[in-house]
Amino acid sequence: MCKLPFSKSRMRQLMEAYIRQKRASPGMVQASDLQISRPMSGMRSNSRELHAYDGPMQFISSPLNPDQILTNGSPVGGTVAMNSTRNHSNNMRTLSTISQEADLIEEISSHELEDEESSPVTVIEQQQTAPHSANSTHSQRPSTTRQPSFNDTLDEDDYTNRNIAGAAPVRPVGLASSPYKEAGLDGSSMETSNGAGGESEGDVIGNIDQFVMQPAPQGVLYKCRITRDRKGMDRGLFPIYYLHLERDYGKKIFLLGGRKRKKSKTSNYIVSCDPTDLSRSADGFCGKLRSNVFGTSFTVFDSGNKDSTDSPRLDLAVIIYDTNILGFKGPRNMTVILPGMTEDDQRVKISSADPKQTGILDLYKMKNMDNIVELHNKTPVWNDETQSYVLNFHGRVTQASVKNFQLVHDSDPEYIVMQFGRTSEDVFTMDYRYPLCAMQAFAIALSSFDGKIACE
């Protein structure tokens, strides 16, 4: 591959001359009222002047020639001889350059010049000397900054009994990311949590065992934190999860604790408001979470007895994860079915243990939506820069995980009923609002920790 003896700017000038000559030839049709401008092109125009050092040919006849060698205290004869030698060499260089221009026109016409510049050239104000302008061109070149990307952090249980290659982690996106605001992921409803829309942060009212079962009041957001304890002999496979309500100045209030039962054919979690006794027979027992064999469907029950007729066990929620047997890559798709709400903001009592009633899951399968509410996870947006799916958690989630999700209703996708995501290896944030209660939200979060054979 031959090396052209001209600078890139000179080659562009020759290419422009060739294009003008070709456009003037018959057979070319061009618009008479359309002026095509290429702001990203590196070609020069008559209305733009670049102040930059462009090689020795640009300053041959200029008194400010940066290549000129000046000597102090030299004899007059020696100076004249040096200038004569320099002028002779410059003239020879000019003659050889002019003789090659005609040959280069045909060579350039068969090759398309590639514009190596990716940003428009900025005109730099001319300084006292030309070399100083050249240095300013390099020092004042605009720099582009890249948004920091989060490393994909996966739990040990993400690799247990599942095909993790089929699941993609969801990353949190910063507040200043305008592409996601255009996509409708600005999460305007979560801005009200800071007090802008009149929504206040919730606090515990009354006893803990009653508070965790009470639906959140409208206009109140509860910010919680889940910690996972995997210390001990068997907590690597059966960790304990603790739910705390976040308060100001780093304070927190314990709400619920949950653990997975060891001797159970399917995943079965016990939830209690007593952190010292996480058993079904404990006084603080609040309910349980049970899954099917494949881990695709979870049902949340309260502390009632399924064999009792006076106070039968009630269905609090059903979580359904879409199956992914073929292994398509993408985030989790989940559907949450809740009991409907009455006019006084109380849950409709639905019991699958009562033979006279139909459970939440059966109502959903029958498409009987009169007394149930259907929620879905908010669809993340694919980011080409980070090659990942992203959601706007407004600073509440800081690490990527397949567990990160937001629950919304189809009628109002900007009203985030619940969001859950990771902040460190064993710490997760969980925020919920009306119509969820702490027990329902905590059970939904526990279902995301459980291994799912057919979902990923």
Curated annotation (Swiss-Prot):
Membrane-spanning parts: none
Pfam families in the record: Tub (PF01167)
Domain of life: Eukaryota
Subcellular location: Cytoplasm; Nucleus; Cell projection, Cilium membrane; Cell projection, Rhabdomere
Gene: king-tubby
Alphabetical list of PANTHER family matching this protein: PROTEIN KING TUBBY, TUBBY-RELATED
UniProt name for this protein: Protein king tubby
Keyword match Cytoplasm: yes
Species this protein is from: Drosophila pseudoobscura pseudoobscura (Fruit fly)
Region Disordered: start-end pairs: 111-202
Keyword annotations: Cell membrane, Cell projection, Cytoplasm, Membrane, Nucleus, Phosphoprotein
Keyword Oxidoreductase recorded: no
UniProt biased composition (Polar residues): 120-152
Family according to the record: Belongs to the TUB family.
Annotated GO CC locations: ciliary membrane; cytoplasm; nucleus; rhabdomere
One BP annotation, GO: protein localization to cilium
Matching InterPro entries: Tubby-like_C (IPR025659), Tubby_C (IPR000007), Tubby_C_CS (IPR018066)
Chief place where the protein resides: cytoplasm
Topology within the bilayer: Peripheral membrane protein
Modification sites for Phosphoserine: 149
Alphabetical list of SUPFAM superfamilies matching this protein: Tubby C-terminal domain-like
